[in-house]
């Protein structure tokens, strides 16, 4: 699964090649100390955290680095995720006005986060107060509602490994595939997670529920990425 990746990468570790462009960002790449493997780090204002991922085209990156073409380069990244299992959840019911309000709030928050990164003290204070207000509202709702009826998507670091994340996102597309190395039946899903769009792959027999467009996938993924130089 996946075509055109360096042989040294997919010969040694599992991989899944995603599609499209997930984000445009300045990428920092570091080699893992214990192995010939590279991790990338980028920031995306949609998520609000630094994303660390296993780099699929590390050999190509080293070639570009030796040519002096990678320093402070803002480029596109295609993310993909490998999951061992997961759960399918029904969507949160929202009307058009709620969707519009959330879109406006998300755009405003993104602008504030960009300003905060540049040292804007007013933006930092606004974000702090907004987070406190959100925490208060969610805490009150949790007394009578299930958390998954309040939070419809999230992207959070998971465990000690820097490139593992716990996610929940809307299913935009789904299809079945077969792992040609193992013969295992897989679900390939395209997800919208905190406005980041990327593909994941998970063994079909390890998914609780039936994935359909509009429903949500919840699970833990190993985040991989392909940098386009």
Model-derived features with residue positions:
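Long, hydrophobic alpha/beta structural blocks
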Residues: 1-159
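Short amphipathic beta-strand/extended segments with alternating polar/hydrophobic composition
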Residues: 51-53, 199-204
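Eukaryotic intrinsically disordered and solvent-exposed regulatory patches
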Residues: 156, 175-177, 205
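Short coil-to-beta-strand transition motifs
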Residues: 158-170, 215
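Beta-strand elements of modular eukaryotic interaction domains
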Residues: 160, 178-180, 207-212
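OB-fold (S1/OB) nucleic-acid-binding surfaces
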Residues: 173-200
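Short nucleic-acid-contacting surface segments enriched for D/E, G, S/T with interspersed K/R
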Residues: 203-219
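Short, Lys/Arg- and Gly-enriched loop/turn segments at beta-strand edges
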Residues: 222-229
